[in-house]
Amino acid sequence: MKTVLIAVALLCSMEASVMAESSVSFEADAVGAAPKGWTATKTGQGNPKWTVEQDGAAPSKILKQSGTATYPLLLKDNTEIRDGFIEIMFKAIAGKEDRAAGVVWRARDANNYYVVRANALEDNVVPYKTVEGVRSSLDIVGRKGGYGVSAQVPANEWLKLRVEFTGSRFRVLYTGQQLFEVEDRTFGEAGKIGLWTKADSVTLFDKVLYGATK
């Protein structure tokens, strides 16, 4: 009987942690237009440009950021998620100053959020928090200081970036492999998920998935 009860408890625990997944499609959006259901904004100055495009290398429409701003930002409307995940496929196309793609979570607004980004010029993946418009890198669990993790980020290739966030603990996965975990309590409330680039990065996004932990 005890074994059965333990098994039931474990099953309930697993079910409680199931994530309700939503997938984003740009098929209904016009090519060259901003995607519906998202708010295009920025942290800092500049003119970001988010458009839906048809990419010959992808079977469906994709999203492109080709403007220039301090940090171009695209927030998903009607997402208030405290614990959950966001996952993307991205392709870094161009950029002299930067060539980056990032995912955002728990965003209060354009100046307050978490982001983890991959950079094809630096070949690394780095977690940050942006507080009142000021960005600072986060320490990785088990290591004090440093600047993210070195990782090959080849340009013009589709790559996967994912973050899972529960409470103050964040787990970052790149190309399907866990890179690191982060512990931070700056933003503990639910917020929006989103997409992010930096400076003159020209970046493509596809297969955007997100969800909340039930």
PLM segments and residue spans:
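Secretory/extracellular carbohydrate-interaction modules
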Residues: 31, 65-135
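Boundary at the C-terminal end of the N-terminal hydrophobic targeting segment
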Residues: 16-22
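Ligand-recognition surfaces built from glycine- and aromatic
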Residues: 187-214
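Short, solvent-exposed beta-strand-to-loop segments that form ligand-recognition rims
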Residues: 168, 173-194
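Extracellular glycan-recognition surfaces and repeat-rich motifs
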Residues: 33-62, 68-70
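Short, aromatic/His-centered strand-loop micro-motif at the edge of beta-sheets
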Residues: 134-162
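Bacterial N-terminal signal peptides
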Residues: 6-15
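Extracellular beta-strand elements of beta-rich domains used
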Residues: 26, 88, 163, 206-210
